[in-house]
Amino acid sequence: SLPAMSDQPLLDVRNLSIDFVTESGVTNATKGISFHLKKGETLAVVGESGSGKSVTGLALTRLLPEPPAVYRTGEIFFDGKDVLKLSPKELRALRGARIAYIFQEPSTSLNPVFTIRNQIAEAIELHRPDVTDVDEEVVKYLDMVGIVNPRQRMNDYPHQLSGGMQQRVMIAMALSCQPDILVADEPTTALDVTIQAQIIEQLVKLKEQLSMSIILITHNFGIIGGIADRVAVMFRGKIVEEGETRSVLH
């Protein structure tokens, strides 16, 4: 019998240096960073604005526009393959389906002219062509993220929902692709504190339920205590501290 693969990290980033090259010069966005993520684990990447944390998240599926981004050194191993060596077609298959994102502003990620149903259905049809009853899937994921009356609400347009509800829809859309890793970049910054707590709590529950891994990118140390297994602290493009959440926060 084969040895258990659980010790093998799902994601293994090694010595990653990314520069932005523009007419006004070169910015070192990340400087030789290394970190890993195991299956079912939550890693918080914490740092102030400009620390390189969002760049790191986007780099995982090469979402940074190239140019200006240049991958100077390093490897990003996901499921044993280096993302930096994948073809455009392989990258498209990776994005959403295996590694999905929730961004800070749901209003910019949701299309105002389509119903909630259409937007989630499109994600499901793209990444899971085998699903026969798409509407049932849409209802299932809206229900999962705590939207009441999902059957009615799925016919709403984004502007008919509150900010917190829009963010839940974004999470439902990301989860409906059944990703291995959910990258949540400041997923609750725009929301009030109570709603922030609810959504973080929801993510923790869903992680258990769907046995996925989460990378939570945030500037807010306050929200990571209850959700992250490990923390990587970024400062000016470097990881300056990394460890179990308990030891880093104390």
Regions found by a protein language model. Give the residues of each.
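ABC ATPase "signature
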Residues: 242-243
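A short, surface-exposed alpha-helical micro-motif characterized by mixed small hydrophobic
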Residues: 224-226
